[in-house]
């Protein structure tokens, strides 16, 4: 079970939102690259970046911050003899040129969310053009998919869309319960497992992690197809210690991802 720190970018800073509300942003660092280094030193094996401005604007808005993070990751990997530390990014990615540019910059995975729901043809083309590097981010409330930075609720059932996108060839699904994200109310295990059981590709849980008990609960259902969990407010506010939580997850699942070698 992989614990993936989230670095949410707004106006070049690292922030956390409550339930996707841009007006409820807490700035945790004005230096995103330094924040990336911090999580790597705490044992992170993968990083999750979100361009919040981009998610609302529909185009990249924090590219310089992303590049600085990627540079920090490269330097850390080289210094420690690590072959690769994957970095994934979502927010405002609406065309193939943007995907190609980001991948050329050094990102391992591109997360497509709203654009996948609104323009499935784009997702299909992206999966074909960049096999193994496209992740779909599905944000849902009460089983219905939300779009546009969570500001709009669609009529699509999350499982139906996930199956469709799996057929397109996406690498994995990030499932966020937006009723719980940033609120630390515990992961929606039941909904996450239900989604994972319906797919053959991995599901990454997101939203609601509060403490080590949430991590242990996810580890207990990892075999249902849950690859990891994205951690945000809990690791920033200290209710979850990333290093000890990852160690505990490794102990419970009796494995360590290759990037830790």
Swiss-Prot record:
SUPFAM superfamilies to which the protein is assigned, alphabetical: Ribulose-phoshate binding barrel
Cellular component, GO annotation: cytoplasm
The keyword Cytoplasm belongs to this UniProt entry's keyword annotation: yes
Active site residues of this protein: 8, 139
UniProt-listed Enzyme Commission number(s): 5.3.1.16
Major subcellular site: cytoplasm
GO molecular function per UniProt: 1-(5-phosphoribosyl)-5-[(5-phosphoribosylamino)methylideneamino]imidazole-4-carboxamide isomerase activity
Compartmental location: Cytoplasm
UniProt KW keywords: Amino-acid biosynthesis, Cytoplasm, Histidine biosynthesis, Isomerase
Domain of life (superkingdom): Bacteria
Protein name: 1-(5-phosphoribosyl)-5-[(5-phosphoribosylamino)methylideneamino] imidazole-4-carboxamide isomerase
Organism encoding this protein: Janthinobacterium sp. (strain Marseille)
Gene this protein is translated from: hisA
């Amino acid at each position: 079970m992989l614990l993936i720190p989230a670095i949410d970018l707004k106006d070049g800073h690292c922030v956390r939102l409550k339930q996707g509300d841009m007006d409820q942003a807490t700035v945790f660092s004005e230096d995103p690259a330094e924040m990336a280094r911090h999580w790597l030193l705490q044992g992170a094996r993968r990083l999750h970046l979100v361009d919040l401005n981009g998610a609302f604007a529909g185009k990249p808005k924090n590219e310089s911050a992303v590049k600085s993070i990627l540079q920090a990751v490269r330097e850390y990997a080289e210094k420690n003899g690590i072959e690769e530390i994957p970095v994934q990014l979502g927010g405002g990615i609406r065309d193939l040129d943007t995907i190609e540019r980001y991948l050329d910059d050094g990102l391992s995975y591109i997360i497509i969310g709203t654009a996948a729901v609104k323009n499935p043809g784009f997702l299909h083309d992206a999966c074909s053009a960049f096999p193994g590097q496209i992740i779909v981010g599905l944000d849902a409330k009460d089983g219905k998919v939300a779009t546009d930075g969570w500001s709009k609720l669609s009529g699509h059932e999350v499982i139906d869309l996930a199956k469709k996108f799996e057929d397109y060839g996406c690498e994995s699904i990030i499932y966020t319960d937006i009723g719980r994200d940033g609120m630390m109310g515990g992961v929606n295990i039941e909904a996450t497992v239900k989604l994972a059981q319906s797919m053959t590709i991995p599901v990454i849980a997101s939203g609601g992690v509060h403490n080590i008990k949430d991590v242990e609960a996810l580890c207990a259902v990892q075999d249902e197809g849950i690859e990891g969990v994205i951690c945000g407010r809990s690791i920033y506010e200290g209710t979850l210690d990333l290093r000890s939580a990852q160690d505990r997850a490794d102990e419970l699942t009796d494995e360590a991802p290759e990037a830790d070698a």
